[in-house]
């Protein structure tokens, strides 16, 4: 189970199931979630999560994430993407705020 502070800025390298997103959005009262996916995944997630202002979806891959440096306090890596960590480590660390953490989701999405 992932633990978040209310003000965390979380990057998800894949879009999890809607119930997980809802739980995150409610926990991150003053924070935010940005999740990466394919065009179809992003369109579906945007439709499903329209009521939440603190959740955003980007059509992007973990190899090249269109976001500013040192923004996220947590980067969540699902198990199916762990094998990419050596290749995407520089990109993840570019986005990670000082003191931020990279965490394994523990569940594949």
Spans of model-derived segments:
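Class I SAM-dependent methyltransferase SAM/SAH-binding core
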Residues: 16-64
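A short acidic, Gly/Pro-enriched loop at the edge of an enzyme's catalytic core
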Residues: 60-75
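A short SAM/SAH-binding and catalytic strip from SAM-dependent methyltransferases
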Residues: 73-86
